[in-house]
């Protein structure tokens, strides 16, 4: 029998660092912890990618990023904005602090972006990262009634290279809409968060009336209040900037986006036209181009292309 209380204390006492997770993986051998590929796994992945691209071995490089690609895309498409506060929110991005917190992925990011004669520049200021998905993967090895018992109630905060990071086990607002889409039956996999956002407009605040429209409406109200506080935080980081760009899949919430204009009348708010993950393709290309302009070897460019450029 699994020593449930001991297991819970090991996992939920503090946010999981790489060192702690490696120790737990050794202690609890009966569990399969998928959190860090070994060198063999990385080699296999590199070989698959290079084969698909028709490149020889060693001719492919990559870097782990997601939210900053949303930021590049949004800033590039924002008309008449030479500088802006960029807020990215979605169901979950990359594991930005891979070396220290390998189970936590981006859920909220604040950047300051500006354009000048040398191109576009994105400066990270704040990120919140959640390990909820990892926790759920481990929780699935327990009975259903214990599915959430590993979540850590306390957030950790660290500052690295001038960027403030907050580590949590709670879901992002994007995750909440995804969970609601599954719970309300809009789809089987929780991929229809946008349907829940649209469904909210048909609901009302009616105490003791919990149909799917009213439930979606309540989530929409909670999400609005939460996001207002995040926008205030972003403004505190950049008090002199009056432009705001919203990106990430969560920025598809049209109803709340309109209300932010009313809440912040002294700011211009621009919503990235392609805030979903398709926009990250453009963002990655824009980031790579800027790195080449700046004389930095791009992480997404094979060595032979960089040497030829």
Regions found by a protein language model. Name each.
Residues 1-309:
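Short acidic/glycine-rich loops and adjacent helix/strand connectors
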């Amino acid at each position: 029998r699994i020593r449930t209380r001991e297991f819970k204390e090991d996992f939920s006492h503090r946010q999981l660092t790489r060192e702690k997770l490696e120790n737990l993986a050794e202690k609890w051998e009966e569990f399969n912890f998928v959190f860090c590929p070994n060198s063999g796994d990385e080699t296999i992945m590199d070989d698959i990618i290079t084969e698909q691209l028709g490149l020889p071995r060693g001719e492919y490089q990559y870097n782990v990023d997601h939210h900053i690609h949303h930021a590049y895309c949004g800033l590039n498409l924002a008309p008449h904005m030479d500088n802006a506060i960029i807020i990215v929110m979605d169901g979950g991005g990359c594991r930005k602090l891979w070396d220290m917190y390998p189970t936590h992925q981006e859920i909220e990011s604040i950047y300051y972006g500006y354009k000048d004669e040398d191109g576009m520049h994105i400066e990270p200021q704040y990120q919140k990262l959640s390990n909820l998905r990892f926790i759920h993967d481990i929780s699935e090895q327990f009975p259903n009634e214990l599915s959430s018992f590993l979540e850590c109630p306390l957030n950790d905060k660290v500052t690295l290279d001038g960027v403030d990071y907050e580590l949590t086990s709670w879901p992002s607002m994007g995750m909440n809409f995804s969970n609601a889409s599954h719970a309300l039956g809009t789809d089987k996999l929780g991929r229809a968060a946008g349907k829940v956002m649209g469904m909210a407009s048909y609901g009302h605040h009616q105490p003791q009336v919990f149909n799917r429209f009213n439930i979606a409406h309540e989530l929409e109200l909670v999400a609005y209040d939460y996001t207002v506080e995040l926008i205030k935080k972003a403004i505190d980081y950049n008090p002199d900037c009056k432009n705001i760009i919203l990106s990430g899949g969560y920025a598809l919430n049209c109803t709340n986006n309109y209300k932010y204009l009313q809440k912040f009348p002294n700011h211009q708010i621009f919503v990235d036209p392609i805030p979903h993950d398709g926009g990250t393709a453009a963002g990655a290309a824009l980031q790579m181009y800027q790195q080449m302009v700046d004389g930095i070897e791009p992480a997404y460019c094979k060595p032979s292309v960089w040497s030829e450029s």
